[in-house]
Amino acid sequence: MHQSEYITFLLQEYGLSDCKPVRLPADPKAPLGDLSVTYPDVPNLRSVYLKLVGELIYLSVNTRPDISDIVNALAQHNANPEACHFMTAKHVLHYLAGTMDLCLCYDHDSDIHRLHAYTDASWANETGHRSVSGYVWFYTGSLISHVSKKQTTVALSSTEAKYMAATHVTCYT
């Protein structure tokens, strides 16, 4: 499954049809919300930003789990987006331009019908002091679902954060 036509539509909609592709969905050197850099003004920033983030959420949930983390971070700024957040969202479009051919593959002929779940957690990131859990589920070797969310309880160690994540993925399964 892929959404290359939808990605092409998004690139055209935001004037990025001929953009230079990038290799990562987020720039590791430019933290999200870096207000020290001057960005151009964007008319109707909030409405344009909300629309773009919604379109990126649609992609991340359906066929592009590789952009889930940055899209989740972008969505946390929906109430009051700055130009830097919009530029980060456009960076994701540059990434999608270079990875349009990525797809999810499902093997309907597989003899192995097993469900596998994997989980991981970050521990108390520097911005929110809350751990983030990530879960992925595979059926017959193909990704069928993925989740990334902040843990509701503050973990006292990375081990505790990972145990909480493992507990939650077990409950979902």
Feature locations, PLM:
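Long, low-complexity, charge-biased intrinsically disordered regions
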Residues: M1-T173
